[in-house]
Amino acid sequence: MNEVKQFIKKFIPLPSKKGEDLYKLTIDKMAEIEARKTPKAMLDYEVQLVEHCNLNCKYCAHFCPVAPESFLDVNEYEKDCKRLSELFDKEVNFIRLMGGEPLLHPKIADFCYITRKYFPNGIIDLDTNGILILSMKNTFWKALRENNINLTVTRYPLKLDVQKIKEKCEKENVKFRFFFEEPVKTFNLLPLDLEGRQQPEKNFYKCYLANSCHTLKNGKMYTCSTVPHIQHFINHFKCDLHICENDGIDIYKVKSKEEILDFLAKPIPFCRYCNIDKRQTRKWETSDKKIEEWT
């Protein structure tokens, strides 16, 4: 990297403020690319316990507004969790239990116990929009507390009793934080190219989801959260987007953790459907379930 920095300095004069800013921007972008194509040292993943949501944000990257009501099977998750635990010797960096809205799952406590059983040392977060927190049963709070699971709330422009939520978590001795201190005001529109005309490698290196939002779904690991949930979009809008075998890696066919980590750090065929250069920030709203929210 130092040799590259010296090479760049030959073309970007540093004495001016503009030159310094351009140099820093270039180095930062190169560092992002390097991070995306470098396999992680440890496992991290997110898993969607519920496909649907009780909020349904416009531009939702998990396509929850157009997803049918669906709950992750506890036994299937335990099977996958056990397999990953075997491959990674029970070591994990962090795990995110999410949705959809995970608090909608009637067996949410089971997922807390299962995840901690197979990964005793890693960080485990349960991500929620907070709407149902104050209505959760004692078994929920006990599961979080006994398994050292952090309750993470993303605040939206809703009437949530923030103080009561904080007090409840303190009373239950559950670790709690807001994902952002202020309510979300904007959402990212991540448009799809329905013709699949984009360059997969270029997209991968420019995408903040790539080799970051690792997702476990139905016995496979994915480099991002788009592919494992895109079927909801395809089914709802009757689109002909092709998902192939090589878009994810089967955790039961690999022989080592390195195979998984290496796969997650590489572009996949489905990357051609993401229109990275057209991504925009939009005002947060609830979904109208129109195709324009994702194209």
Question: What residue spans do the PLM features occupy?
Answer:
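Short, flexible coil/linker elements and helix-boundary hinge sites characteristic
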Residues: 1, 10-17, 89, 148, ...
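Exposed alpha-helical structural elements
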Residues: 3, 7, 76, 83, ...
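Flexible, charged surface loops at secondary-structure boundaries
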Residues: 88-90, 144-146, 265
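Conserved alpha-helical substructure of the radical SAM core
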Residues: 7-9, 18-126, 133
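Radical SAM enzyme core and accessory elements
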Residues: 1-33, 273-295
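Accessory C-terminal segments flanking Radical SAM cores
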Residues: 192-295
